[in-house]
Swiss-Prot record:
GO BP term, pick one: 'de novo' UMP biosynthetic process
Name of the coding gene: pyrB
Lineage per the UniProt record: Bacteria, Pseudomonadati, Pseudomonadota, Betaproteobacteria, Rhodocyclales
Any one GO MF annotation of this record: amino acid binding
Keyword annotations from UniProtKB, A to Z: Pyrimidine biosynthesis, Transferase
Binding, carbamoyl phosphate: R65, T66, R115, H149, Q152, G278, P279
First-tier enzyme category under EC: transferase
Keyword Signal part of the UniProt annotation: no
Sites where the protein binds L-aspartate: K93, R182, R237
Protein name per UniProt: Aspartate carbamoyltransferase catalytic subunit
Length: 319
């Protein structure tokens, strides 16, 4: 069966997940993003690649960083951008997701950027567009439930490649609440596809998926042991909003065991980089001295995110 993200020519049609996406597509996105990083340095930060196209940002969950970077990316490509305010929209008045999509499609939308609390919502939209003969409209998953956050995974890969070059000689550690993290799932899919020989996940048993070892990773419940000789440390926040009343340690208890401090970071390689998808909780999963330190590349991740999202939208808009 054909990958629903690719057209009959094997080109990117939607970006829904990094799981199962071919290595050459991921690499092509990273390669396409590289020249877009230079656009930010220009006096006029505009390219005409999506001129005349309409991009609708459909954010059914709160977001600042992701929504803003998608908006900036689309505008730098000269697209017309519509931000749907879900709090006051028809979805709060009982309209279904697909009815909302139908109505926006009737406004000649060319691309939907979708964030939704329900895993699979962007897939549902893409399937609906295909079934109703509107598969010229592209869908980008900006995060769905616990399932996936593909553009975050891609910008993380771009960041690693920028600082480390080759993926095939790295040890990468993902630390924290993997169980509730769509970012972690996208990171693991991309890292394994790109040939990283050792991906580690580090966290308490209660915050790791039961099937995590089947994802091709090494599991550590001792943070100090897991950080030994790693090249990249990817921190994750506690996803309190997805825990549904689970028993949690206090922030102080969590920080003591799982917070990244300078002392714990010293166990990694001397040139290891520290990443975080944001928002960051200082004094919980990461110490301020580390977040603001020379090994942190957290702000460059945000900058690279614009270029990566430009790459995704320009590739989708050209097919």
């Amino acid at each position: 069966m054909r990958n629903p993200q690719l057209n009959e020519h094997g080109e990117l049609q939607h970006l829904l997940t990094l799981d199962g996406l071919p290595r050459q597509i991921i690499t092509a996105i990273l390669d396409t993003a590289a020249p877009f990083t230079e656009v930010a340095e220009r006096e006029v930060k505009k390219l005409p690649l999506l001129r005349g196209k309409s991009v609708f940002n459909l954010f059914f969950e709160n977001s600042t960083r992701t929504r803003t970077t998608f908006e900036i990316a689309a505008k730098r490509l000269s697209a017309d951008v519509v931000n749907l305010n879900i709090a006051t929209s028809s979805s709060n008045k009982g309209e279904s997701l697909l009815d909302t999509v139908d109505n926006l499609s009737a406004m000649q939308a060319d691309m939907f950027v979708v964030r939704h609390a329900a895993s699979g919502a962007p897939f549902l939209i893409a399937q609906h567009l295909l079934a109703t003969g509107r598969d010229h409209i592209r869908v980008v998953n900006a995060g769905d439930g616990r399932h996936a956050h593909p553009t975050q995974g891609l910008l993380d890969m771009y960041t690693i490649r920028h600082y480390k070059g080759d993926f095939t000689n790295l040890v990468v550690a993902i630390v924290g609440d993997v169980l509730h993290s769509r970012v972690a799932r996208s990171q693991i899919a991309a890292l394994t596809t790109l040939g990283v020989p050792e991906v580690r996940v580090i966290g308490p048993k209660t915050l790791l998926p039961t099937e995590v070892e089947r994802m091709g990773v090494r599991v550590f419940h001792d943070m100090r042991e897991g950080l030994k000789d790693v090249d990249v440390v990817m921190m994750l926040r506690l996803q309190n909003e997805r825990m549904n009343g689970a028993l949690l340690p206090t922030p102080q208890e969590y920080y003591k065991i799982w917070g990244l401090t300078a002392e714990k970071l010293a166990l990694a390689k001397p040139d290891a980089i520290v990443m975080h998808p944001g928002p960051m909780n200082r004094g919980v999963e990461i110490d301020s001295a580390v977040a603001d330190g020379t090994q942190a590349v957290i702000l460059p991740q945000v900058t690279f995110g614009i270029a990566v999202r430009m790459a995704v939208m320009s590739m989708l808009g050209s097919h």
